Design a protein with these regions (language model features):
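C-terminal catalytic "cap/lid" subdomain
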Residues: 1-129
Length: 129
């Protein structure tokens, strides 16, 4: 409900979303937090310019996981396919980038994958068309 979320933001409130959901039958489910953030951003993008930042423990998507200086500055859908084929993007980074691409395709102005430290300083990996 993007309108409700927008109303909360307009009132100066910061909604917090949890990746734990339920199936309606009493069982708890651990959902992908990036999927939830992407869904919220896609909804908000219908109301206003929206930027999404996925924060995790690395400085961005790295060509070499052991070299923090190997951050890939920008990934497009085309380059993502090549990075997967090369084995650079694997495991948990796959759904993170796919959620980012879906968000951009749905009108989110920008998506960045990065560390939370220094979040106001440009950096990380920008996902674009």
């Amino acid at each position: 409900n993007a309108t409700l979320i927008g109303s909360l933001l307009d009132a100066g409130l910061t909604p917090v979303f949890c990746a734990i959901t339920h199936d309606g039958n009493g069982s708890l489910l651990n959902c992908n937090a990036d999927s939830i953030a992407s869904a919220v951003a896609k909804g908000l993008a219908r109301l206003a310019d929206t930027d999404l930042i996925f924060c995790f423990e690395q400085p961005g998507v790295m060509r070499d996981i052991n070299d923090p200086a190997s951050v890939i500055a920008s990934i497009t859908r085309e380059s993502y396919g090549a990075l997967r084929a090369e084995g650079v993007v694997t495991d948990g980074m796959i759904p993170k980038i796919e959620n980012a691409l879906e968000a951009v395709d749905s009108g989110v102005r920008s998506v960045t994958i990065r560390r939370s430290e220094g979040i106001l300083i440009p950096g990380g990996t920008r996902i674009s068309h």
